[in-house]
Amino acid sequence: MFNPGNFAIYNKKRVIVLSTENNNAEILDGSIKTTVPLSKLESYTKIPQGMAPITMSAAQEHTVKAICATLGYQFNGLCMHDVSTFIGTFKEKSIQKERAK
């Protein structure tokens, strides 16, 4: 249900899933990484109050698609803050993986 790159809700806060293994997820909550059971995550389905809906520039859209293609991740962000978080969290990892080919 949750894949790396997905946003989810944990303890009523929006988090991003970094990895999943053995029914656990490593999540990033702000700048804190932690591991939680997948069963403790909830689907992220509503734009947070006061956040702008997604209207990506061509460069942002290209970057998100490239990260997803390189890392096999799925972007499910709903607001512009999610776009920034996703790119900031995974861009360098994506570049390193592409260079390692």
Functional labels for PLM-detected ranges:
Residues 13-21:
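Short beta-strand-centered aromatic/proline hotspots
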Residues 25-29:
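SH3/SH3-like beta-barrel fold
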Residues 1-11:
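Short coil-to-beta transition motif at edge beta-strands of beta-rich domains
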Residues 50-100:
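Basic helix-extension-helix modules of the SAP/HeH family
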Residues 30-54:
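Intrinsically disordered, low-complexity, charged/polar segments
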